[in-house]
Amino acid sequence: MLLEVALIEKKDDGVRIERKVRYRPKPVIEAIGPKKVPPEFFAFIETSTWDRNKKELKFVNVPTSHKISSMMENTGVLRLREAGGQCERTMDGEIKLKLPFFLKPLAMVGEAVIQREGLKILDAELPVLNRFIAEVVRAPK
């Protein structure tokens, strides 16, 4: 669940839309061991480019916390394509946590949690995306 979405920057050249958006999801982890995790650790900036011709969105998500951004990489591509008179959405992405050797087992758990929560966000955005497809992607030219 997203607590905040703020558009920081948007450029539209007619073919591509470049944007930066700040997201602050609801924290899913309150503590790691005895240490509390501040809610701001979950905030991130999405830098993305939507290519109208390719119907493709390339993105990089960078945590706003410097401490977290040095330990995490998240990139991906979202594609829309015609599929039997309907629109198919596919997403390829990578979440990588760069932790010290002795914390490597936590990286696998952390990556799985981040992926699960990211999929929840994608599911919640589906009604909005369906409207976007109807009004923008399939709009008469």
Regions found by a protein language model. Give the residues of each.
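Polar/charged alpha-helical tracts
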Residues: 3, 30, 131-134
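Hydrophobic ligand-binding cavity/cleft-lining segments
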Residues: 1-27
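Short, mixed-charge, low-aromatic patches
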Residues: 2-5, 34, 82-85
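Structural motif
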Residues: 11-13, 53, 83
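Beta-strand/loop substructures that line and gate deep hydrophobic ligand-binding cavities in soluble
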Residues: 17-20, 37-39, 43-44, 49, ...
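A conserved amphipathic terminal alpha-helix motif
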Residues: 52, 106-140
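Short Pro/Gly-enriched beta-strand edge/turn motifs at strand-loop
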Residues: 26-32, 57-64
